[in-house]
Amino acid sequence: MHYKKAFLASLLSSIALTAYAPPEPWATLTPSSKMDGGTTEYRTSFGLAVIPFTVTESKVKRNVISQINDGQVQVTTQKLPHPVSQIGDGQIQVTTQKVPPVVSHIVSQIGDGQLQITTAKNVVTKSTIAVPSKTVTATATSTATAVSQIHDGQVQVTISSASSSSVLSKSKLEPTKKPNNEKVIKVQACKSSGTLAITLQEGVLIDSSGRIGSIVANRQFQFDGPPPQAGAIYAGGWSITKHGTLAIGDNDVFYQCLSGTFYNLYDQSIGGQCNPVHLQTVGLVDC
């Protein structure tokens, strides 16, 4: 009987070990390629501003990303450019607004981590916006709106429509100089309640609540955990390009896709209501 019990115990142990597969560390969920010259370390808190692609380089519309409580990132629709905000769950959102002559929209964050873009009229004395191969500098008063985050971590951006006054003179476009690590972020925006504030540590994005920035199964950009949401595609491999835009792997093109009164952010287009954008990194200042 003793040997029979020992045999059964050994058999059950073998079955358990065979069925067990150690989970893959989320930090290894990274793209196979990297951004050439990208910065993977930036421990000072910074925000994100949405720069939609336009017909000409001189027309720059910047919406700051906000984040709702669950970590999702969204962009709301408003008449002024807004920073990305974050709602409570970590989602990122961007509201829709009309862009003034020179405006920075900062993403805000709500309780769950989602990101949203609120409408703030904070004035910035000087704003320099880096875009591929070019740098747009404006010394006139600028409206800076930080992206917000809702409670779940989602990132949202409110809907904004660019006005004709958002055209910048081509004479102010200058080649971008190669930045060092301290100067990789060249744009500043006013920080307000709910503004998405993140740091970059060894290629991992972390929001002010300690949640991890990731591209989840449906390709949406949001903050969760740690660990990231189950089924996440990427949780590491983030960097800031030499132009000051956020990148995942070797890609710095994201998509804001309309969802009701706000946009969600994705690393790929998921349909006809999506538009390509750059996520400009911005320094956060109290105004």
UniProtKB/Swiss-Prot annotation:
Keyword terms: Cell wall, Cleavage on pair of basic residues, Repeat, Secreted, Signal
InterPro entries documented for this protein: PIR1-like_C (IPR054508), Yeast_CWMannoprotein_PIR (IPR051153), Yeast_PIR_rpt (IPR000420)
Site (Covalent attachment to cell wall glycan): Q72, Q91, Q114, Q154
GO molecular function: structural constituent of cell wall
Site residues by UniProt (Cleavage): R62, N63
PIR1/2/3 repeats: 62-80, 81-99, 104-122, 144-162
Functional summary from the UniProt entry: Component of the outer cell wall layer. May be involved in meiosis and sporulation.
Entry protein name: Cell wall protein PIR5
Species this chain originates from: Saccharomyces cerevisiae (strain YJM789)
